[in-house]
C-alpha cells in the first residue's frame, strides 16, 4: 500500500494520492510492513514517531519524499510577538505551548559534560533564517547574535540580540521538539527514511551512559536505513544509533557513587541482559546523508550501532561552535561498534572527526577523508581489536590519538601527528566473534598494532609524533614479547604490565620529518618535502602530494587474514563482518592496487594531484 502526505491534505482523508493526509504522523498510524509513505513538497513541523515495524529487511516500511520535491521536517516553530527593549528583543511564551518537553527548562548536562557546569545551557535554540544564534548563560552577555532564557510566572522568556534585524519581519524560529523522526517506543524495526531535510531538534547531551535521542534515530531497534537526507542544526546529536534509558541515564552525574567508567562497564552487562544482540539490535545502514551544524555529534551511538554500515556521508561543522564541551563530541562517536563498517565518508571542520570508544571489535574504518578538523581526525580508545583502519586520508594537523591495541593500519596517509598512550587503570570488554556476548575484559597495554603500506608526513609538534618512532623500544614479535615477560619470573598481570606488547611495522614511506620505528626492516625514509594538501573547491576534493623517486620501487605488503597477526588479547583473526577472510586489494576509489602503497593505486613518484571526492 502507498500512502501520500501533502500540505493540501487532511488527516481525515484516506491517504490516497488524490486524498492525502496532512501530517506524516497520521501516516505512521496507518502504514504497516511493506507499505510506503510518500511525502510531498512542503514544511512539516512535527516529530514523526513511527508506530509499526517492518517484518524484515525485505518487508520494511518506507518514508520518502516525493521524487523531485523538497520536503523539510522541523523541530521548530516560527515565533512572532518579539518586543524591543534597549537594543535587545524579548518574547514571552506560555509554558503550556511546549507540552511535555520544554527545551528552555531542559539543560545540557550529563555524564562527561565538562563545560559549562556553573550555569548550564539549554537544549533549545533560536534561529534566524536557519542560522543559529549562540546561547549565553547571563543576560549581561547578550552581544550580537546571542540569546538568553529565563523562567518568569509560568512563562518562558527569551531575550535575543539580533543586531539590526527585526525578528518579527523575517523568519525567526525556536526549537520546541526534541526530535524530528524518532520512535517513542523501542523495537520499531525495519524502517527506511529517505530524501528529507530535517532540522532544528532540541536534542539533549548524549553520553554512552544515558538515553541517546537524536534528531533522527531508530531508538534501540534493528534494520533501519537512513539515506539521502540533509540533517542539520540539532542542538546535540544528528543521527542517533544509541542506547535507550533502561540500562542507565547519567548515573555518574545523578548519583556519583561510582566513577563514570564503572557505570559504563555496568551498562555493557545491563545491555546484554536487556536483550542486546545481533538478532534484535543494530544492523542499520546510514548512507549518503549530509550532516552539519550539530553541537555534539553528526552520528552517535552506544551499543545500538553494532553490526551497522555507515558510508558516503558528508559530515562537517560538528562541535565547532564550542558552546559546550565534553568527552563525547565528534563527527562520528560510537561505543561498541562491533562489526561496524564506516567507509567513504568525508569528515571535516569538526572538533574531532571520528571517535571509536570501547569495543570496536571487528570494526573497519576504510576509505574516509578527513581534513581541517579542529583538534584531530581520529581517536581510537580502549579497544582490543581486531580493528582494521585502511585506505584513509588523515590530513588535519593532528591525525590520531592512539589508545588502541589489536589494530591494523594499512594503506593510509597520515599527513600530521599522532598522540600515543596506554591505559592500565581501566579494563574494557572484548567479545566472542561477531557477537555481543562478552568474552572478557582487559587493560590497554599499548602496542600490538600493525602498520603496513602507509605514507607518513609532517613533523613532531606539541608532544605529538609524526611517523612510528614512538614505538622505539617495543618488541617486534609475540615470541620476543613473551620471552621478555617471563624473564620477570612467575607472576600474574603484574609481569605483563612491565613489558610493552609487540608491534608489526613494515613497508611504510616517511616524508618531511616523519620517522620510522627503529626495527622496521623495509621502508622509505627521506626528508623530502611532501607538500601535501587536501583541499575542497566547488564541491570537489583534491589530494596533492610530492613523492620521492624511491616510491615506485617500494612494493606493498600483502594484506589479508593470514598475513596479519592475531591480536594478543582477543585472539581473533582479522576478517570481514560475515566471518569470511579479509583482503585489502582495492584502493579508496575502488581501483585495483598496482604494486603501490598508500590509499590510491595510481600514486607515483613526483607531484600527484588526484580528485578523491566529488559532491553528487
What are these regions (language model features)?
Residues 410-432, 456-461, 465-485, 515:
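Non-catalytic carbohydrate-binding regions of carbohydrate-active enzymes
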Residues 330, 376-378, 395-400, 433-440, ...:
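Short beta-alpha connecting loops at secondary-structure transitions
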Residues 189-202, 222-236, 248-271, 277-297, ...:
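Right-handed parallel beta-helix
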Residues 212, 295, 328:
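Beta-rich catalytic cores
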Residues 4-220, 230-232, 240, 246-276, ...:
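Extracellular polysaccharide-degrading/modifying enzymes targeting complex plant/algal/animal polysaccharides
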Residues 354-356, 377-380, 440-443:
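Solvent-exposed loop and edge beta-strand segments that line ligand/cofactor-binding
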